[in-house]
Amino acid sequence: MDFFRNQFFIGFSINFILIYIFCKIPLMTKGGWISAGILGTILWGCLSWQGWMSVVIYLLFGSLVTKIGFKFKKEQGIAEKRGGRRGPENVWGSAATGLFLAIMTKFNAANIVMFKVGFAASFAAKLADTFGSEIGKRFGEETYLITSLQKVERGTEGGISIEGTLASILGSIFMAFIMLRLSIISTKYHFIIVVVSGFLATLSESIIGAKFQNKYKLSNELVNAIQTCLLYTSDAADDC
């Protein structure tokens, strides 16, 4: 009976039952759904249903905002590939750092609060980035390169707009609120850290994109991973 009460078994069962039911919805590719199932199983085992639910909400809203103005973005040649459906590289590129921190809560209880704050901030950063990118590409009136403030075309790596920047702030606040409501974080201080860190991480990703992405042929997924790793490093320094 202990096996059936095991959080990893519960997570595995719930994840793959839900994926079997909802996999026809065009939010992810087949590989994306499988990756989401593996991710969800580990998160449930490490952070119980709250950690799992927080990432489900992140994936849902990240996928939905990608669909906003998709026809327009496709006509402009700046839409996400595969009709906006998320593949394995998207799942792991955005979730790898958060997953690592979730796993660490099982092995280093003394720093569990720091790991949870880092976990929350990593997903706040990614939702902020998705909100900013997708809203900016559709509704941004003017786009500027973050490193020089020169006007550039929509969809340019490292490009920012007022509309996209405001959407990034909203995405970070929303994800921090979800983490607070689900008790991943528990204080107003941590809420502020997550919001600010999430937004600053989107700016850092824009800088990385502007300076290095095209020059060194970095994929969006690699830039995502670098962004969240830098974010955790800064959060850990703040908590020390």
Language model: regions and residue ranges:
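Single conserved hydrophobic/aromatic residue that forms the stacking wall/gate
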Residues: 232-240
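Interhelical loop and helix-boundary elements at the membrane-water interface
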Residues: 2-55, 59-176, 189-231
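Residue-level marker of positions within ordered structural domains that often coincide
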Residues: 105, 183, 238-239
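Membrane-interfacial helix-loop-helix connectors in multipass membrane proteins
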Residues: 182-188
